[in-house]
Structure formats: C-alpha cells, structure tokens
Amino acid sequence: MADLSRTLPICAKGGVAGAEELLAVATTLAAARRLRRQIDDPELRPMTTAVVEGLRTLPELEQRLRFCIEDTGRVADRASPPLGQLRQQIAAARAERRDRLNELLRRYAALLQDSVIAERNGRPVLAVKAGAASQLPGLVHDSSASGSTVFIEPQAVIPLGNRLRQLEGEEREAELAVLLELSGLVGQEAPAIEQLQQILLQLDFGLARARYGAWIGAVR
C-alpha cells in the first residue's frame, strides 16, 4: 500500500500533488476495492464485518484518477481536451522540424562533420565544420573543445523551435490544470482516504491471519 502521508495533507490544503502521487492514491483505492471483494468470502466475513462497516472504496474517484493519469505516471492526453489538442500540435511541430532538419542534413552534407542531429540548450543543432560555419545561416549554440566544429541551429527551424517552446509551456499549464482538479477531488475525500488506509491495514493483517490459520488447519 502506498504511503499517502505527504499527498493527502497537500491536497486537503488546496495544494497540487504530482501525477505519480495521485496515481498512488488510485492504486490505494484499487487495493481497497479488491480487498473488499475478497471480504465477500463467507468464511472470512464474520471476522471482517465489524472492520469493513466503515470502508468506503470511492470508485468514482479511482476511475477519474485512472482516466486522467497513465500507469507510467504521465497525465493522459484524454485528461482534458486542451491538453490533447496541444500534444497533437506538439507532435506535428516536432515531426515538421525533424523533416526539415533531415532535409538540411542532405543539402549541407559537405559542410558537416557528421550526419547526426545533436542538441544544445534544448535546441537541435548541426555539427558544422568551423571553416564553413558562415555558409549555414543560423544560431551558434556551441563549439567543440578543439574549435574544429561549430554547433548551429539552422535558421530554417528556429521559428518552429520557438513555436514548440510556446506549445510546451502551454502543455505544462494544461497538465497543471488537470493536476489541480484531481488534487481538489482527493482533498475533498482526504479524511475518508485516511480512514480507508487504516482499515486496509487492519484487514490485511486479519486476512493474513485467517489464511495462516486455514493453512495450519486451525479450527475456530
């Protein structure tokens, strides 16, 4: 069971929890739901009835969290229409920039030290022979230790790079809006989730004892 001792107070106070922290809440709710299903076993019910009376599994909250956050801890595209649209635009812009860079690799092959698209300061650059740097319009981001290579971001892709940075900033804002919404939902149920965790610990211990008793042939 995940440790929610940090996440729940943050959400209860109106703060924003991270995607992985919110996923841990969903995992805990799922564990409670599965355990509740096990309790339907008639042989276990007498022992667990008193404990389970206060168990709320919050299935709607679990479903909402699972819908918005992928198993990897990434906010899902479907979490909000703006986020999904922004990611489509980002993917399209990256593909367009990649195509242009590959075209430039072919066009300026004679000027390059190698045919690899490198990265400097988060921007794509071509490794240009220092003596030929003036023949490739663009922004110089770096040079090799020997000075024989200059890393240039071609002018042809700079506007796309700027557009990508803008879109990525908007993507982060859209992700934050989703996390804020989900954190608010968790915050509203923080007392119930805390109680649920305590009940889970009791049930887990009780079920373990029951299974052990059955294994050794104990008779109650």
Segments from the language model and where they lie:
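Extended, Lys/Arg-enriched charged tracts that mediate electrostatic binding to polyanionic substrates
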Residues: 83-132
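SMC-family hinge/dimerization module
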Residues: 115-116, 120-154, 161
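Intracellular alpha-helical coupling/juxtamembrane segments of multi-pass membrane proteins
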Residues: 93, 171-206
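Extended, charged coiled-coil "arm/hinge" scaffolds of SMC/Rad50-like chromosome-maintenance ATPases
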Residues: 59-70, 159-180
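Conserved amphipathic alpha-helical "coupling/scaffold" segments
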Residues: 1-86, 189-192, 196-210, 217
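Glycine/charge-rich, flexible interdomain linkers and switch-proximal surface loops
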Residues: 108-124, 186, 190, 197, ...
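Coiled-coil heptad-register positions
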Residues: 40, 101, 105-108, 112, ...
